[in-house]
């Protein structure tokens, strides 16, 4: 079974706390927060003006083909950066056959920025009202031809594969908040099946358009605690009142143990066990699926709960979500 063991040898992070794992770790240790006021939300008069944005990010530092930036949503740009950083961290340049290098990413829904949608909207408006009958002719004619390529969830993985010259397995998982974790799991399975020697896996999301903010506000999921942005989101706290929207991407380099040892790689972690399960609708007070997934993952890893040193909970900071998660962890 040693040849089937999967290890992690590289990590790349692009987050509101910084770019690169060293920067993020230092700010975590210092107790810093990536939540702050978002200028365009303040200017637009949104009822919620705080968020966690990635600052100081220049995609041109990570995307070699500058022309491709025109058809890359921010989600894809963040994903490419995280993947490039992970591969640098792992030192796999020239150490892996491109045909045996794969990519698997978890992706979120992608919304077009307002500047892309505005020409289409204006072409369909008559006396202040959107006329759907004009969409097929005037609306499409005013739309940038490659717009739809930017919002396809699988485009992030495609751009990462191109950036890394990864010619092995490539796929995208779109399962909400667990997409990135499931991508890591499926990447490990691909390695164990012998289809690849190295996989780059992770997740990316940038829900920072006005459409995204408005949707989550209407759903009642956003914290209204504006006076102290850093303390607005309070997972599992009695005073929690909602989440804070953010953006970011993370990627890990996974390898079979034999491949990592053969090239003298630094091993950061081992992938021991995993599980997933169906979760009931969010209106339910408990989540037996989450509890079952936790138990099954421990069994798969051959571990007891007492052997776990860290639980990385979702901690959505909504009243119902935190209650269901706390019940499952108990």
Residue ranges of model-derived segments:
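Short glycine/threonine-rich loop-to-helix capping motif typified by GTGT followed
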Residues: 281-290, 316-330
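Conserved beta-ketoacyl condensing-enzyme motif
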Residues: 8, 23, 29-170, 205-213, ...
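Acidic, glycine-rich active-site loops and adjacent beta-strand->loop/helix elements
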Residues: 12-14, 107-110, 175-179, 203-208, ...
């Amino acid at each position: 079974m040693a040849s089937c063991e999967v290890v992690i040898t590289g990590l790349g992070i692009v987050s509101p706390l910084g770019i690169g794992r060293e920067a993020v770790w230092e700010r975590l240790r210092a107790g810093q927060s990536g939540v702050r006021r978002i200028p365009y939300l303040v200017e637009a008069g949104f009822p919620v003006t705080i968020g966690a944005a990635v600052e100081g990010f220049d995609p041109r530092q990570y995307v070699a083909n500058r022309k491709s930036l025109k058809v890359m949503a921010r989600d894809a740009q963040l994903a490419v950066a995280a993947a490039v950083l992970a591969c640098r961290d792992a030192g796999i340049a020239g150490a892996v056959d491109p045909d045996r290098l794969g990519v698997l990413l978890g992706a979120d829904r992608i919304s077009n920025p307002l500047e892309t949608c505005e020409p289409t909207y204006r072409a369909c408006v008559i006396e202040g009202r959107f006329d759907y009958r004009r969409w097929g002719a005037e609306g499409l004619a005013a739309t940038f031809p490659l717009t739809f390529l930017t919002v396809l969830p699988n485009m992030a993985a495609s751009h990462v594969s191109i950036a890394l010259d990864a010619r092995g397995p490539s796929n995208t998982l779109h399962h909400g908040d667990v997409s990135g974790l499931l991508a890591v799991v499926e990447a490990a399975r691909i390695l164990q099946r012998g289809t690849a020697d190295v996989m780059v896996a992770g997740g990316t999301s940038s829900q920072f358009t006005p459409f995204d903010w408005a949707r989550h506000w209407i759903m009642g999921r956003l914290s209204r605690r504006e006076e102290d942005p850093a303390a607005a989101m309070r997972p599992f706290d009695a005073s929690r009142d909602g989440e804070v929207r953010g953006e970011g991407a993370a990627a890990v380099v996974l390898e079979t143990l034999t491949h990592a040892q053969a090239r003298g790689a630094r091993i950061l972690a081992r992938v021991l066990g995993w599980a997933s399960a169906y979760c009931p609708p969010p209106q339910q007070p408990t989540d037996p699926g989450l509890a079952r997934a936790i138990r099954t993952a421990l069994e798969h890893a051959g571990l007891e709960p007492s052997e776990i040193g860290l639980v990385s909970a979702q901690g959505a900071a909504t009243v119902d979500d935190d209650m269901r998660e706390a019940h499952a962890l108990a």
